Amino acid sequence: MQKYVCDICGYVYDPAVGDPDNGVAPGTAFADLPEDWVCPECGVSKDEFSPEA
């Protein structure tokens, strides 16, 4: 699955890991994240993420 990188702080969302601290289970694709999910490092929305090159 595609990893996504926060354009602001560089946090990498890895679908294989998810974001368990914020209730996102491993195996959750970026597109399937809740609309109100934000970067756990800097708090920006999903709109501020780009696919990892």
UniProtKB/Swiss-Prot annotation:
Its cofactor is Fe(3+). It comes from the Bacteria. GO terms for biological process: alkane catabolic process. Residues 1-53 form the Rubredoxin-like domain. SUPFAM superfamilies: Rubredoxin-like. Fe cation binds at C6, C9, C39, C42. InterPro entries: Rubredoxin, Rubredoxin-like_dom, Rubredoxin_dom, Rubredoxin_ET, Rubredoxin_Fe_BS. One of its GO terms (molecular function) is electron transfer activity. Keywords: Electron transport, Iron, Metal-binding, Transport. Binds 1 Fe(3+) ion per subunit. PROSITE patterns: RUBREDOXIN, RUBREDOXIN_LIKE. CDD domains: rubredoxin. PANTHER family: RUBREDOXIN, RUBREDOXIN-1-RELATED. Belongs to the rubredoxin family. Rubredoxin is a small nonheme, iron protein lacking acid-labile sulfide. Its single Fe, chelated to 4 Cys, functions as an electron acceptor and may also stabilize the conformation of the molecule. NCBIfam families: RubredRD. This is Rubredoxin.
